Amino acid sequence: PEFRQYFFEGELDGKPFNRRQRSIVYQRAKNEKQTISFGMQDEPNRIGYEWAAHSIYPKKNDFSQFRVTIGNSQCSKPYSASIFNISAMSYGALSKTAISSLNEGAKMGNFAHNTGEGGISDYHLKGGDLIWQIGTGYFGCRDGKGHFNDALFVEKANLKEVKMIEIKLSQGAKPGHGGLLPAEKNTPEIARIRALEPHKTVHSPS
């Protein structure tokens, strides 16, 4: 194998990554130059080689093709959703700067931002459309005993930013065990957002 790798294999041989791909990783890790002047190692005329060609008259994009309407005639407020959106990531798992940036990006790009099961924070309200995710812990719409709170739900559901509500049926990352918010992470701000008592460990059922 050593002779094959160092003496006989070409730059484009080897699996799962060839020598050229491995070299790029090494160079980037060392912050070294990644470009080579003149010529190329690949054969652009070979069958299967793919490239992008410039067009003198580029086609105009029909952005309506990248949206889908959610809700039929029975829905009072159907939503025109982008096919590309921001997946569920809670405030607490991500910083306030990250959540604010993602939401502002959703506003600029006209797509939706999933809150994650951690509730709707102030940083989610930067003008982007929201998909409010409600998990097994009912964060943001629960009472002091952890039961579903109708009044809090109605209050959050009526926010103009909330376009859809997603019900998370189980803890997929920890099946059979449920989630856990440690007491040290349950700060007064997190507790306010999630309708919790601060500085106490909180379990989310599986």
PLM regions: where:
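Glycine-rich phosphate/ribose-binding loops and adjacent secondary-structure elements
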Residues: 200-206
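Active-site pocket-lining/capping segments in soluble small-molecule metabolic enzymes
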Residues: 171, 176-197
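Conserved, well-structured core domains of diverse proteins
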Residues: 1-176, 182
